[in-house]
Structure formats: structure tokens, C-alpha cells
């Protein structure tokens, strides 16, 4: 399993958007400059984020992007799901057909890892990251204490 650049950049760009949206729509060129992410790459990512209902685009003078919901209601799992084709630790894509049509010996292990990762990322919102950054506690985004 790998979190690709798409997922990482999408989370970074969404955090930037959330932190700079108080003054109105944010231009992708501004995010590109602040985060050192190519503008064309951001355009591709924001197309996916818009289709997933996480951002809205505003046209015209002063146009750009805004969050489609408050930062407290957008979690990291949603962002990664919109940007990545698939974030999955199983070899079979969670179809349980990895060993000649049947689940392999470690299928449940990887499925449980998927669930744990999704639970954690689903518990972390843009707002929680911003608050911890503003409080100077950037060393630990959100402590995950519930392991099955």
C-alpha cells in the first residue's frame, strides 16, 4: 500500500485552502506558490476534489476555490478517497480472491489494516489539523488510541 503524491498534495492543498479561505475564494496559483505544487497538478487534483463535493469553484474576478463544507466536516479520508484511485493494503483490492479465487492467508490482516487506516484518517478533520498547528502542537496531528 502506498499513499501517492496525489493524496499527499491533495491534503496539503486542502489545508492551505482551509487556512486561507477566510478572505474569500483562493486561487490555485496562490496555493501553487505557497506549497510549491505545480499549477497544472493542482488543477487536476481540484477537478477530482470538486467532483467529490469537497470544494466549489467560483468564476469571474475574485474567483477561485472555497471549501464546500466547514473545515470541521471535511476529513482526511474523504480527501484521499477523492484524490487517489485506491488506498488499499490488500493485493486483491479487497475482493478476497487473491489466492486462486479465495482469500489468501493474510487477507484479514490487510483488511483490518485498511479499516484502521480509514478509521484514523476519518477521525482527522482539516479543522483539527489547523487547530493543532495554531496551538503549536504540530508534533502530533491527532493521537490514535483505538486499535482493534
From Swiss-Prot:
Gene3D superfamilies, per the entry: Winged helix-like DNA-binding domain superfamily/Winged helix DNA-binding domain
Domain (HTH rrf2-type) spans: 2-131
Keywords in alphabetical order, please.
DNA-binding
Question: One of this protein's Pfam families, by short name?
Answer: Rrf2
- Coiled-coil regions listed: none
One BP term from GO? regulation of DNA-templated transcription
One MF term in GO for this entry?
A: double-stranded DNA binding
GO CC, alphabetical: cytosol
Q: What is this protein called?
A: Putative HTH-type transcriptional regulator NMB1378
